[in-house]
Amino acid sequence: MLTRAGPLLFAGGFAFLLFVLLAELPFGDPVMAVGRVVLDEAAATVGAANIVTSVVLAYRGIDTMGELAILFAAATAAGLVLGHPGKADQAEEAGGFILRAGADLLFPLLIVVGMYIILHGHLTPGGGFQGGVVLATAFVLPVLARPGQVPSHGALAIVEGLAGAVFIATGAAALAYDHEFLTPLLSPGRLGALVSAGTLPILYLAVGLKVGAELAGLLIRFTEADAESPR
Amino acid sequence: MVWVIGLMMVLMLATAIAALVLDNLIGATVAAASVSLGVSVLFVLLRAPDVALTEAAVGAGLAAFLLALALKRLGLWRIEVQQKEEDGRAD
């Protein structure tokens, strides 16, 4: 009885807290004034047609670097728990016909869609994180279809490390020009052009490759782990 | 617009309940992923396409992938027909 009461009490208290907070706020009336300022300023100063990107990479660039660091730490910890890579020789049999044919068809499509989402991150919705996830699924799908042929973890680690280094180097380059860390360099360019918004596309490409390589490595390690672990 | 929101609410509730109720764990995984798809449609209607894209990629894609791999690792990745066959072989 008492074990049930605890979570119920917590949920009730939490609901009460939310209710009190919401009762004080006028509905649909933003309390923060920052959003309005960003909407007015971002297109002219940063040059990204997608305002979200200008917030994520230009105004809150260090937040994004923190996110990358958190993702890296989580992937490393999961890799440690999941154990040794390799051991492809005892791989299970290949997937069924539908899975194999679907993986062959979807692989190029997913690569193109992922790269499109990453490279147009400063113009259209999406960006490095979303495109990176799409790229990761593109590389894990063939592993599911043919468990024997695994992309090497070394290559994935090199891509991930280079992408992270490019992100930090782009941020550090701003220091050389007496700006703050991760300030967008180069000219904003014409709003809506593919080559615009200064260094933001480079940053998003780095984010996308890093996230993609990281998640692909993690998921592939997950598929390998199930072959060797006892039930 | 309102009826799309209503449809999505019904769909999300139905798939969420299906994820809880279904005995077939593969079906439950798919149902859990389709809740995320409904959420991402709602995000598009609320004019947050960036969040919708993240929800579709991570919530529907990656989370379903992880759930499926976890099922496979636990040895629960099978449909009932196969299960009966394996049980019959064990006898």
What are these regions (language model features)?
Chain A
Residues 23-45, 182:
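Interfacial/capping segments of alpha-helical transmembrane domains
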Residues 126-135:
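Structural signature of hydrophobic alpha-helical transmembrane segments
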Residues 118-127:
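Membrane-interface helix caps and helix-loop-helix hairpins in membrane proteins
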Residues 75-101, 225-231:
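Cytoplasmic juxtamembrane regions at transmembrane-helix boundaries
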Residues 156-186:
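A structural-propensity feature for long, helix-poor, extended segments
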Residues 70-79, 136-139, 143, 203-218:
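Hydrophobic cores of alpha-helical transmembrane segments in multi-pass inner/ER membrane proteins
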Residues 1-16, 152-164:
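Alpha-helical transmembrane segments and their helix-start/interface "positive-inside/aromatic belt" motifs
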Residues 40-47, 52-65, 190-205:
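Short aromatic-rich membrane-water interface segments that cap or initiate transmembrane helices
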